């Protein structure tokens, strides 16, 4: 009986200690879970902030690059005269359009390719070219004063110094294990308490068996407490790892938010620079790069227009060759079909003449059907015009197509 009382007291003390250990572990684990959840969310938001900050740096880069590009273009093309080369190329393309007479077979109301050119747009382009030249150098001086080449490099350097590649600690999975250990101690205490209540009602053999079981459990309690302490140590280690992760996130947040705030303030300044740049571009001739690009695009467009017209005539000629070839094939095939149909019709007539009087009409009504035949119908959406092809001296295939077309026509 004294042993039972001793084991019960030991079990009660062990249960109190186990509850304390589990309570401490639970608190550390819950605090760690809360901090980890918040820090992970903060980490993700920080990555988005880093992307946004990088995007703002990129915008600054683009703005700086645009300013430098505009300055270079102004230096290379400071006056309207230096755009004359592009203008002359455009005029050469337009002259080719004037000299290119439209084939009458096309049925167009115009006489040459130049009739398709928008004269109003061309004159507007020339007027704009003349209008932007006078104030170029004043704009150049103002624009040069807005260029801050070291600004973006400084922001990039500070942004790259903020590392966000660290990972959160792995999840602590000792909670269920500690709960099981606490349950073992609680069950042992319950068994000891129950044994005290029923001990006097048991036989000597039952008392002996009960004492053996309780003694075995009592001997196991210290190892359970050791495991609980180990679990608490592991939870504290996990808590410290979470705090270290949280500290990294907080530190990176402090640095990056300060950088983003500063960048936003300077972005406003940069926006003012961009607004001033747009104003100068509209008023003092910074449209030169755009106008030069328009000249290049127009020259290319009208050059390709002339080439496309020549290619169109060759395409019509190619289609004529195709139609002649197909018609020749169809004519030959139709002749063969008619020959076969005539032979088949004769065979059916001969058969009917020989056996028709002896075959009842109700035996097979189709005995007098005509032979299988086909109808080939030509579908042409638009009749091809009879245009004159402008041969390409360097295009041997064009000459071969023209030769094959002539051969097919003779057929």
Curated annotation (Swiss-Prot):
PANTHER family: AUTOPHAGY-RELATED PROTEIN 17. The keyword Thylakoid does not apply. It holds the Pfam family ATG17_like. Keywords: Autophagy, Cytoplasm, Membrane. GO terms for biological process: autophagosome assembly; macroautophagy; mitophagy; pexophagy; piecemeal microautophagy of the nucleus. Belongs to the ATG17 family. Residues 388-411 are annotated as: Disordered. Autophagy-specific protein that functions in response to autophagy-inducing signals as a scaffold to recruit other ATG proteins to organize preautophagosomal structure (PAS) formation. Modulates the timing and magnitude of the autophagy response, such as the size of the sequestering vesicles. Plays particularly a role in pexophagy and nucleophagy. Homodimer. Component of the atg1 kinase complex composed of at least atg1, atg13, atg17 and atg101. Interacts directly with atg13. InterPro entries: Atg17, ATG17-like_dom. It is found in: Cytoplasm; Preautophagosomal structure membrane. Residues 390-404 have a biased composition (Basic and acidic residues). This is Autophagy-related protein 17. It is a peripheral membrane protein. GO terms for molecular function: molecular adaptor activity; protein kinase activator activity. Coiled coil: none annotated. Disruption phenotype: Impairs atg8-processing. The keyword Cytoplasm applies. GO terms for cellular component: Atg1/ULK1 kinase complex; phagophore assembly site; phagophore assembly site membrane.
């Amino acid at each position: 009986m004294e042993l039972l009382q001793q084991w019960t007291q030991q079990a009660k003390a062990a249960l109190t200690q186990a509850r304390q250990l589990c309570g401490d572990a639970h608190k550390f684990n819950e605090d760690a879970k809360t901090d980890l959840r918040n820090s992970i969310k903060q980490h993700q938001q920080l990555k988005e902030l880093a992307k946004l900050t990088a995007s703002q740096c990129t915008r600054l880069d683009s703005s700086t690059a645009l300013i430098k590009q505009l300055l270079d273009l102004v230096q290379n093309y400071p006056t309207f005269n230096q755009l004359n080369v592009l203008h002359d190329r455009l005029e050469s393309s337009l002259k080719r359009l004037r000299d290119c007479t439209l084939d009458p077979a096309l049925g167009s109301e115009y006489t040459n390719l130049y009739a398709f050119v928008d004269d109003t747009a061309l004159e507007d382009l020339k007027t704009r070219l003349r209008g932007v030249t006078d104030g170029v150098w004043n704009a150049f001086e103002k624009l040069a004063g807005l260029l801050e080449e070291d600004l973006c490099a400084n922001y990039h350097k500070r942004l790259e110094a903020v590392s966000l590649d660290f990972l959160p600690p792995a999840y602590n999975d000792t909670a269920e294990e500690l709960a099981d250990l606490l349950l073992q101690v609680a069950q042992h205490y319950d068994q000891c308490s129950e044994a005290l209540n029923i001990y006097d009602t048991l036989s000597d053999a039952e008392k002996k068996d009960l004492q053996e079981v309780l003694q075995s459990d009592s001997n196991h309690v210290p190892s359970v407490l050791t495991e609980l302490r180990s679990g608490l140590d592991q939870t504290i280690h996990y808590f410290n790892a979470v705090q270290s992760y949280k500290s990294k996130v907080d530190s990176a947040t402090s640095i990056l938010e300060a950088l983003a705030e500063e960048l936003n303030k300077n972005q406003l300044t940069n926006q003012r620079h961009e607004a001033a740049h747009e104003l100068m571009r509209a008023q003092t001739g910074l449209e030169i790069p755009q106008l030069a690009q328009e000249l290049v695009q127009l020259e290319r467009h009208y050059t390709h227009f002339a080439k496309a017209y020549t290619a169109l005539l060759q395409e019509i000629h190619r289609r004529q060759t195709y139609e002649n070839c197909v018609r020749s094939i169809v004519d030959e095939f139709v002749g063969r079909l008619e020959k076969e149909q005539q032979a088949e019709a004769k065979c059916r007539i001969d058969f009917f003449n020989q056996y028709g009087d002896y075959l009842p009409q109700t035996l097979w009504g189709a005995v007098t059907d005509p032979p299988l035949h086909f109808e080939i119908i030509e579908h042409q959406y638009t009749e091809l015009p009879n245009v004159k092809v402008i041969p390409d001296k360097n295009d041997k295939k064009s000459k071969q197509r023209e030769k094959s077309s002539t051969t097919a026509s003779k057929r």
